[in-house]
Amino acid sequence: MTEFDLSTREGRWKHFGSVDPVKGTKPTTKNEMTDLQSTHKNFLFEIEEVGIKNLTYPVLIDQYQTAGLFSFSTSLNKNEKGINMSRILESVEKHYDNGIELEFNTLHQLLRTLQDKMNQNAAGVDVSGKWFFDRYSPVTHIKAVGHADVTYGLAIENHTVTRKELTIQAKVTTLCPCSKEISEYSAHNQRGIVTVKAYLDKNNDVIDDYKNKILDAMEANASSILYPILKRPDEKRVTERAYENPRFVEDLIRLIAADLVEFDWIEGFDIECRNEESIHQHDAFARLKYRK
């Protein structure tokens, strides 16, 4: 049995089964290697979207840095075998050098870079992340950091924006109107999870505070907003406000829709409200879709 020098890393590797590289015959330099993706002939069909998913990369949302989860795609002509996926990461890295701010204008610039680098007509991106923001308790006005989940969706074809979407998911408090009506005192309440997917005006820039406008529609129409820090005067206010504003999921979803329909920069929306029922083992939910 061969003895290896266990005082060295290489010796220990071989002791545990590593072997020397084979003497290969294939090229080792890029210029000599076959580029299968660049093969040109009739491959029968165009592909609408091909790319990568689940890429985690640092992004900035307002003043906070967070982790963005990206999906990128481009189109592919029928006379091309494949795309060079490494160029997607090269495009991202080029923009990260300048700091990727999660806004539609920066995503548009990133897609234009991707479009040019891949030499394709269409490109798209979806990116999700935690949006952190300052939140003050309602009575004592103590500041803490709140958060919601956001997803940006953008697609372009040539120089035209074909898809422009923003999804926000936030948690609220809902107090049951039926429980309040039938009980001598109190009422059951729970966390509600509200998701709004807004289809934005593709031909114009969004307003400056568009995220806050949508979040306000989601939270203000609930029984109560959630707060990171509550002192006793705050807790009293939150409890009483919830009792004064009971909401079924049906109520909440309609009230949110009534606010969103007034925004001329929103072309349509999907809303889902889901209550994690505190007196049941199941959840309650409602969904609504609206297009102008």
From Swiss-Prot:
Coiled coil spans: none
EC id: 3.5.4.16
Entry's Gene Ontology BP terms: tetrahydrofolate biosynthetic process
Domain of life assignment: Bacteria
Catalytic activity: GTP + H2O = 7,8-dihydroneopterin 3'-triphosphate + formate + H(+)
Pathway(s) where this gene product acts: Cofactor biosynthesis; 7,8-dihydroneopterin triphosphate biosynthesis; 7,8-dihydroneopterin triphosphate from GTP: step 1/1
Gene3D superfamilies named among the record's database cross-references: Urate Oxidase (3.10.270.10)
GO molecular function, one term: GTP cyclohydrolase I activity
Keywords: Hydrolase
Site positions for May be catalytically important: 176
Family: Belongs to the GTP cyclohydrolase IV family.
Its job: Converts GTP to 7,8-dihydroneopterin triphosphate.
UniProt cross-references to PANTHER family, sorted A to Z: GTP CYCLOHYDROLASE MPTA (PTHR36445:SF1)
Name the record gives this protein: GTP cyclohydrolase FolE2
